[in-house]
Amino acid sequence: MPDVKCVCCKEGNECACTGQDCCTIGKCCKDGTCCGKCSNAACKTCADGCTCGSGCSCTEGNCPC
């Protein structure tokens, strides 16, 4: 079974974890142990188009400040 990339996104990074709850708690996005540049289209849009600087929080296509 191939690795499944989570759709959760923090500051333009996504968690690429299998069998972990990073999508729920965002832990591996925060500690950076398995983060990569976000490939999720909605998150890319958020990360690239956020006008809130470091205040941008991207989760599953939502881009709140």
Swiss-Prot record:
GO terms for molecular function: metal ion binding. The keyword Metal-binding applies. InterPro entries: Metalthion_4_echinoid/annelid, Metalthion_4_echinoidea, Metalthion_dom_sf. Keywords: Metal-binding, Metal-thiolate cluster. Induction: By heavy metals. The keyword Transcription regulation does not apply. It comes from the Eukaryota. Belongs to the metallothionein superfamily. Type 4 family. Metallothioneins have a high content of cysteine residues that bind various heavy metals. This is Metallothionein-B. It comes from Strongylocentrotus purpuratus.
